[in-house]
Each structure stands twice: as C-alpha cells, then as structure tokens.
C-alpha cells in the first residue's frame, strides 16, 4: 500500500533523525543541513550544498582535477591532455568515462590515451617546469597532428608553485601559436569536482575563446546554427541528441566536450543558440558567451519522451516557424515508437521505486524518464550540487521525496536499507555494496556499459536496462551462504 505525502514525510523525517544519532553532536548538526524531505514552497529543496565534506566520513564527491580533466577537457578528442603531476591521478581515472569519439587514436584523436608528466621526488624538490617543456616538445614530435595541448594540474603543482602559465605561453610562441592551455585544477582546490568545472570553463574562456584570431575562422553561419554544450557523449548520448536537433531542422556546428574538437569550440561563438545538457559543469561558459557574444542558452533534457517533447519545443521556440513545425513533426514521428516501449515495459515496472545519487544533472533529469515507465523516484541527491541545482530539482520531485546532499556511505546504505527501493541508481563505488545487499542497481554515471539513453529511440534501451535490473531472475536464484 502506497503512503500518503504526510506519511512519507513523517517516515523520512524519522529516518533522517535515526541516521543522525550515529554521529557526534557537532557532526550530526552539520549533516542535518544536508538531509531533508521535499516540501511545497521550498524553492531549493531546503538543503545546504557545495560545502566541504566532513573529515572522517566516507563521501563520494571527486576532486577538482576530476572535474576539469575527467569531465570538461578530457573528451576534446584532437587535443592532448597532460595529467601534470604524479602518475596515479591520470592512471586510475584512465578511460573510465566512456566518452565515445570518432577518429584514429594516437593519430588525430587522443581521448583514450594517458599522458602524464610522472612526477618523481626530484621534480617536487627542483620543480617541474623544465620537464613540462620537454614533454610539450615530445608531444609535438610524436603526435604532430594534435590541435592543442592542455596541462591539467594535479595537487603537487599548486603546492610547489610551478609556473605552468609561463611554460604554456613560451611553448605556444615557440610552436607558432599552437594552442596550449594551462588549467589550475589541483585536486585540493574547492569543495568537490565542481570547482574543477568552473576552472576548466575559465580556461576555455581565457585561453581559447578570448585568444581566437577572427581572420583565421572562415566559418559561414546560418540562421539555424546551434551548439551542444556539456554533453560528454557517454555511450554515444551526444550523437543521439545531435540527431534529434538536426531532424527538427537545426544545424549543429559544435558539440563539446563529447566527440568535440578545438575547432568546434572556436566555432561556438557563431551559434544562434547554445543548448546546454549538463548545467552544473558548463553553465559558466554558457553565461560568458551570452554576455560577450549575445548567444542565448537553454538547458535541455532528452531523457524519456515527456522531457524530450518539452525540450524540443523549448529549443524550437527560439527559432522561426520552420523549426517549430519541425519539432512537432519529430514529436509525432516517434510517438508510436515510444508508445510501444511504454506498452511493453510499463506493466513490468509500474509502481517500482527508485533511489538516485549521482552527479551533474542526472539526479533530476532522469526522474521523468522513470515516470514515463510508471516508476517513482523516492529519494535523490547530488554528489557536488549547488543551490541552483536543487532549485531546478523541485520541478521534478514530489512532496515527501527524501533529499540528501553529499550523502555519506553510511547514510545512503541506511536509507536504502529502511526504504527498500526496487532499484538504486548511483556510481561504480556504490554498485557492489548494494548488489551485495540484494538490491538491483544501475550505474547511472556511464550506463553500466550500455546506453545511449538520450533520444526517443534510445528510451527503449533505458527501459530495457531498468527492467533487466529489477526483474532479473538472478535475485531469486542467489542465496546467502548462511541461508543455503
């Protein structure tokens, strides 16, 4: 029997209080600000966010280096991105994001390659600027078709005061204006990977867009040019988004970072509209282009038919009747397909509950995709969200929904144990914990090696994967050794 809003709110409030009892008083007081239930009239879900995690508790947010190199810069395929510092940061994050791209790896595309300055003790003592210069020389010799280089600083670089900006300027001049971008994304900076996004956006602004030679770019604009910003092509998502935009009559002149190029970044100021997928990681550069170049931007959501329809109409509203009619034509074209998907999977998933804890946009964007299948998200939260992320979340969640910011491992496990959702959607670090608890799980950062999930036809993949996770017969076949 489903609970009323009042009963759900009371249960979740009691659960929050129970979880907080495990902490010392000071810690409990701090964590209480991050845990709540959604109430009507609360414009930001009434939680505190973007605050440093408490030392001593196990939390999930990544660092600023991950936000810059792993999210924003890393997928730019024709640039080489140096993990500047000890080998571990680049090595252990190597190829983990499934940023699909087209190109010849090692020739004109470098996304899945790992470039590191491999700092040793002597580099810490004497500095690594000369080593960085040598690395740039080696890159230019070994990979002559690269279009640019970014220097992604790891923690020691900031601590010892290396001047990566001076090195970048010197080597860029030596190689006749070759784009070399220093990025101050040391992991100790800021609260989470979110500052890494911001730093990376600032680097794009200062070292790419503001340094462009207007005479070099012979790009010919049209009235229907758009740029896809903040789609990282996880499992091919950006390609699916691009197809829909082109089907309604728009011309996609750039998509980045996923399967993106330096030239596309440089073309973006010619767009008539920037369509923004991941608000958290790329709203900064979108706002900059709006202020400097007068390009409006709109956040879109291509997860599930309900949000795709709304987003296509919102995007089309910025153009003339040709594009508006194109949007309606595309919506009608795919209706039979999505109706068939819903008819197949909704009876199997109706009433199933989901708890989410992910980064970026997913804690809110996928909610209506679950709703299209008759499923209900009963708890959600952000790894590195800000106040404006939670403001945007209020439009997606129902009153009584459990909201948790920067949730600790203990809290999340306890919430799942007590609420008993039918599915948990989170990251790789959480996956095996919950599967060992017997809870169906989907990895919602990189789609568990599936996807893409964007677009009408890809909604079928999303529905299949959720059904496969929840209704797999394996849950009835596996028994704990002590129950066998």
Curated annotation (Swiss-Prot):
**Ranges that cross the membrane:** none
Which catalysed reactions does the entry list for this protein?
Answer: N2 + 8 reduced [2Fe-2S]-[ferredoxin] + 16 ATP + 16 H2O = H2 + 8 oxidized [2Fe-2S]-[ferredoxin] + 2 NH4(+) + 16 ADP + 16 phosphate + 6 H(+)
Q: What general EC class does the enzyme of this chain belong to?
A: oxidoreductase
Q: Which InterPro entries did the record assign?
A: Nase/OxRdtase_comp1 (IPR000510), Nase_comp1_asu (IPR010143), Nase_comp1_CS (IPR000318), Nase_Mo-Fe_asu (IPR005972)
Q: Where does [8Fe-7S] cluster bind?
A: 63, 89, 155
Q: Please list the cofactors this protein needs.
A: [8Fe-7S] cluster; [7Fe-Mo-9S-C-homocitryl] cluster
Which N-terminal residues, if any, form the signal peptide?
A: none
**Which UniProt key words apply to this protein?**
ATP-binding, Iron, Iron-sulfur, Metal-binding, Molybdenum, Nitrogen fixation, Nucleotide-binding, Oxidoreductase
Cofactor annotation comment? Binds 1 [8Fe-7S] cluster per heterodimer.
GO biological process terms, semicolon-separated: nitrogen fixation
- Molecular function in Gene Ontology: ATP binding; iron-sulfur cluster binding; metal ion binding; nitrogenase activity
Q: EC annotation?
A: 1.18.6.1
Where does this protein hold [7Fe-Mo-9S-C-homocitryl] cluster?
A: 278, 445
Question: Has keyword Oxidoreductase?
Answer: yes
Q: What does the sequence similarity comment in the record state about its family?
A: Belongs to the NifD/NifK/NifE/NifN family.
Its quaternary structure?
A: Tetramer of two alpha and two beta chains. Forms complex with the iron protein (nitrogenase component 2).
Q: What is this protein called?
A: Nitrogenase molybdenum-iron protein alpha chain
Q: Which organism is it from?
A: Herbaspirillum seropedicae
Starting at the broadest rank, the lineage of the source organism is:
Bacteria, Pseudomonadati, Pseudomonadota, Betaproteobacteria, Burkholderiales
Gene name of the encoded protein: nifD
């Amino acid at each position: 029997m489903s609970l009323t809003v009042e009963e759900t709110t009371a249960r979740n409030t009691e659960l929050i209080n129970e979880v907080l009892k495990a902490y010392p008083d000071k810690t409990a007081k701090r964590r209480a600000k991050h845990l709540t239930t959604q109430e009507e009239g609360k414009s930001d879900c009434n939680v505190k966010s973007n605050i440093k995690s408490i030392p001593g508790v196990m939390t999930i947010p990544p660092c600023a280096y991950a936000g810059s190199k792993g999210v924003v810069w890393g997928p730019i395929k024709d640039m080489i991105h140096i993990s500047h510092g000890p080998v571990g940061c680049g090595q252990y994050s190597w190829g983990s994001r499934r940023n699909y791209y087209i190109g010849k790896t090692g020739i004109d595309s470098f996304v899945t390659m790992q470039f590191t300055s491999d700092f040793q003790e002597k580099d810490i003592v004497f500095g690594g600027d000369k080593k960085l210069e040598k690395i740039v020389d080696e890159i230019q010799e070994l990979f002559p078709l690269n279009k640019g280089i970014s220097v992604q600083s790891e923690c020691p670089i900031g601590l010892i005061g290396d001047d990566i900006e001076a090195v970048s300027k010197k080597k860029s001049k030596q190689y006749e204006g070759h784009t070399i971008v220093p990025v101050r994304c040391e992991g100790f900076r800021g609260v989470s990977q979110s500052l890494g996004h911001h730093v990376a956006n600032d680097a794009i602004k200062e070292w790419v867009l503001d340094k462009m030679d207007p005479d070099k770019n012979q790009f010919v604009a049209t009235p229907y040019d758009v740029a896809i910003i903040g789609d990282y092509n996880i499992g091919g998502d950006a390609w699916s988004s691009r197809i829909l935009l082109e089907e309604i009559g728009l011309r996609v002149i750039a998509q980045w970072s996923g399967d993106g190029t330096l030239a596309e970044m440089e073309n973006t100021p010619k767009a008539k509209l920037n369509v923004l997928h991941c608000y958290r990681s790329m709203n900064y550069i979108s706002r900059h282009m709006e202020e400097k170049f007068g390009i409006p931007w709109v956040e879109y959501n291509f997860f599930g038919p309900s949000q795709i329809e709304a987003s296509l109409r919102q995007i089309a509203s910025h153009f003339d009747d040709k594009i508006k009619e194109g949007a309606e034509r595309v919506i009608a074209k795919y209706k039979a397909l999505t109706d068939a998907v819903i008819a197949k999977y909704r009876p199997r998933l109706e009433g199933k509950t989901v708890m989410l804890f992910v980064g970026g946009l997913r804690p809110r964007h996928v909610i209506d995709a679950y709703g299209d299948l008759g499923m209900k998200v009963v708890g959600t939260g952000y790894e590195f969200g800000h106040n404006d992320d939670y403001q945007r979340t209020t439009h997606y969640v129902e009153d009584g929904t459990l909201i948790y910011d920067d949730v600790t491992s203990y809290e999340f496990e306890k919430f799942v144990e007590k609420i008993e959702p039918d599915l948990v959607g989170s990251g790789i670090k959480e996956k095996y914990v919950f599967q060992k608890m017997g809870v169906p799980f989907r990895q919602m950062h990189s789609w568990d090696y599936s996807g893409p999930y964007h677009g009408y036809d890809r909604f079928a993949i999303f529905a299949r994967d959720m059904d496969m996770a929840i209704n797999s017969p394996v849950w009835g076949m596996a028994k704990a050794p002590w129950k066998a």
